[in-house]
Design a protein with these regions (language model features):
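Short, well-structured N-terminal submotif of metal-dependent ribonuclease cores
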Residues: 1-40, 53-62, 134
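Acidic, PIN/NYN-like endoribonuclease modules and their adjacent C-terminal/linker elements
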Residues: 2, 104-134
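Conserved glycosyltransferase catalytic-site signature
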Residues: 7, 42, 100-104
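A generic structural signal for short hydrophobic patches within well-formed alpha-helices
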Residues: 10, 45, 122-123
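Short secondary-structure boundary segments
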Residues: 42-43, 80, 119-120
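Internal alpha/beta domain cores that form substrate/cofactor-binding pockets in large enzymes
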Residues: 65-68, 78, 93, 123-134
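Active-site neighborhoods of divalent-metal-dependent phosphate/nucleic-acid chemistry enzymes
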Residues: 74-116
Length: 134
């Protein structure tokens, strides 16, 4: 089973104490140990860089970016076909954000069914299943 890693997973691990921190850490440990086949996208990496640079935390931007690149052997590019599909998802999926629509489109276009995320918005996307984080 291949799992798409959303930006909030490594960001919870790197962040302040939070109820999602330990489940996120356990998941990333499984990825690092190759018990989970993980992938992500260039858009996820962009989100990480954007978030931490906007906070003035370039150290964390680099650290979290490097972690994701290290443990995700596949980083999917975002293409015109993906943004076209994201546009379509926005019109048929109530309440989905543009960012989540791009992630979902990349996943669907690469036949990745599972996502590791704490974002319940993905539950509304047909063809996407959110991994339970425990």
């Amino acid at each position: 089973m291949r799992v798409f890693v959303d930006s909030n997973i490594p960001m919870y691990v790197a962040g302040r104490e939070h109820e999602n921190q330990d489940p996120a850490r356990r998941f990333l440990d499984r990825v690092r140990d190759r018990k989970v086949e993980a992938c992500t996208s260039t858009e996820v990496l962009q989100e990480i860089l954007y978030r931490y640079s906007s906070l003035g935390r370039l150290d964390l931007a680099s650290e979290v970016y490097d972690l994701v690149v290290e443990i995700c052997p596949v980083v999917l590019d975002v293409t015109l076909a993906d943004t076209d599909r994201a546009r379509d998802l926005l019109s048929i999926t109530a309440g989905i954000s543009a960012r989540d629509a791009v992630h979902a489109a990349v996943m669907l276009n690469h036949e990745v069914e599972w996502i590791a995320t704490f974002d319940a918005g993905f539950d509304r996307v047909r063809g996407i299943r959110r991994l339970k984080m425990a």
